[in-house]
Amino acid sequence: VTTTPAGYGTAMTTMPATESMGFGPLRISFDGRVLRPRPWTEAQSTWAAEILTTAPPGPVLELCAGAGQIGLLAVLGSSRPLVCVDMDPAACDWARHNAADAGLADRVEVREGPMDEVLRDSERFAVVVADPPWVRRDEVTRYPEDPVLAIDGGDDGMEVAWMCVDVARHHLLRRGTLLLQLGTVAQVDALRDRLADDDLVVTEVRRCERGVLVRLDLT
């Protein structure tokens, strides 16, 4: 039985139409309040799943989770728990919904709020997956179909990405991995420069259809 997030079907509430799409073997539901899943971001899930085969034991953390599709697909073939974090209540509702639809509700926890506040200081993760907004603030009007919160990366497009890096640095297990999505090679270069003497090291970069995936390992 498929359910929808709270608030649907009430006489006093008008909600955007529900949509669904395939994401790998998963069926992901969402509406216009959250960023539409991009099929090409399956590459991030696939790479994360590969990393999990040799990562240290431990759960997976997804930051800026949206409807949850990247993290859900990443852990689908494993038995690892997943924690999804997002600021947007609607995104969190859909992430819970999609976890249940995927049969993963028993090992997926969704937390709503700032990423640096909803994690316990002692929590550690084997892999962190992050798809932060990376569009420069002065360019968000080029994408009127997308919720601003989901794409606004600040003045340089890196504001939320830096937050993801800081959270990952604190919460990764030793030898753990952050798999980060960015928008441009220039953003990757900025990341390399800032982390030149850091314990979190850029070890591989892959270009995708629209964006760049960066693997960072905690040494």
List PLM regions with ranges.
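Conserved SAM/SAH cofactor-binding pocket of Class I
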Residues: 40-143
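Class I SAM-dependent transferase core
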Residues: 13-54
